[in-house]
Regions:
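Phosphate-binding core of ATP-grasp and ATP-grasp-like enzymes
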Residues: 173-175, 179-182, 187-221
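Alpha-helix termini
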Residues: 56, 80, 103, 130, ...
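Flexible, glycine-rich phosphate/dinucleotide-binding loops
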Residues: 30, 55, 102, 132, ...
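ATP-binding N-terminal substructure of ATP-dependent carboxylate-amine bond-forming enzymes
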Residues: 1-99, 103-104, 108
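Short, surface-exposed linear patches
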Residues: 42-47, 69-71, 90-94, 115-117, ...
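Active-site nucleotide/adenylate-binding loops and adjacent lid/helix of ATP-dependent enzymes
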Residues: 2, 15-21, 25, 61-62, ...
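Residues at the C-termini of beta-strands that transition into short coil/loop
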Residues: 50-52, 73, 97, 127, ...
Length: 221
């Protein structure tokens, strides 16, 4: 994956001009207010782009007067859609559309992490119940089944045996959407009732936090 070069300053009519930053939001939370304040303190012009009220005219030659769009949208579908449009318009986005699309697909994300040498869970993708059962035999049980796309711990399941895995996957097949025909499978990690969330910038962990819960799904505690 190639890194995206983001602008830091611009020249207009031969004179240096401040960066014009568009901040895409669903709600102005405390974090977004801090970002806007920090940008203003650095002489960056900011425009709040409210996802629910904005309209993107795809056929107009006019473009929003921004040099960079920072995605702080809560709704992934809306945020990803807006970023793709700005990307087509030649306006850089943060995160890049490539990064957003990678994070939206667990299969692609797992492949990217493995390719980058990042330690991760044993993970496999299968496309039939019989091949998924082979994964269960190799990884052992319990086996975790996740949707390819999704967040907040939704639609996660723990199969404790081959029989329960078969039943679970048969139910997924009946849901009808193409996402449920791809079986994303991970080994189960026996851990304390917690999740560790780390924030990495430039290859360095700058902060981390525990999320504690009694349920085995702890990432949304």
């Amino acid at each position: 994956m190639t890194a995206t070069a983001y602008p830091t300053s611009f020249s207009a009519n031969g004179n240096d001009a401040p960066m014009r930053l568009g901040v895409l939001v669903s709600h102005l939370r405390e974090e977004e207010k801090l970002i806007l304040a920090a940008a203003g303190a650095r002489g960056i012009e900011t425009t709040v782009l409210q996802d629910r009220s904005m309209v993107l005219d795809l056929t107009s030659p006019a473009r929003p007067a921004v040099d960079l769009v920072l995605d702080r949208c809560v709704a992934h579908t809306r945020g990803a859609c807006v970023l793709r449009v700005f990307d087509r318009w030649g306006i850089p986005t943060l995160n890049s559309t490539q990064a957003v699309d990678t994070c939206d697909d667990k299969v692609v994300m797992s492949a990217a992490l493995a390719a980058a040498g990042v330690p991760t869970l044993r993970t496999a993708v299968a496309f039939s119940i019989e091949s998924a059962l082979q994964v269960g035999e190799a990884f052992g049980y319990p086996l975790i089944v996740k949707p390819v796309s999704g967040s907040w711990g939704r639609l996660l399941a723990k199969a404790n045996s081959p029989d329960s895995l078969r039943t679970l996957l048969e139910q997924k097949q009946q849901l009808g959407t193409h996402h449920h025909g791809v079986f994303y499978l991970q080994e189960y990690i026996h851990k304390p009732g917690r999740d560790i969330r780390s924030f990495v910038v430039g290859g360095e962990v700058i902060a981390a936090s525990y999320r504690n819960a009694e349920h085995w799904i702890t990432n949304v505690a």
